[in-house]
Amino acid sequence: MLGIELRIALTELVVIDRLLKLSDASHQIDHSHFFYKNVDMDYSETINWKEYFSTPSTGYLHLKRICLGEYIEDAIIIISGDKDMIDFIIEFQAESLTNKKINNIKNFILESDINISDKDIEVIYEEY
C-alpha cells in the first residue's frame, strides 16, 4: 500500500476555490474542520480565504472521494499557510501508483484553467 501526498504550492488565494471545484470536493465531504478566531467551523463555500489566512492557519476536508481526472476514494485535503503562501495538500492511499497515473493527475490539474505550473506540484509517496 502506498501513502500519496500531492502538494500544490499556491500564491493566489482564489485558486483554493478553483481547486475545490475542479475536484468536486464540496459534494463529497465526509467531515471537515477549520479553526478561525478561536471558533471551530466546518467547511463552507462562503469562507473568506483572505480573512482566514490573514494569520497562519490550517484546515482540512475529509472526502469520500475526489476527482483528479479519475476518482480517488477516501482522500484528505489539507489547506495550510498564510496570506503569502498556501499549501494545498491532497493525501490518499493506493495499492500502486505508476508514473503514468501520476502524470495523468498532474496533467488534469495543469490543463484546467487554474493558474498552476508544473513546478508548483510535488508528488510524494511512501510504501508501507
Label the predicted regions.
Residues 1-35, 125-127:
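Short, extreme N-terminal segment that most often corresponds to the first beta-strand
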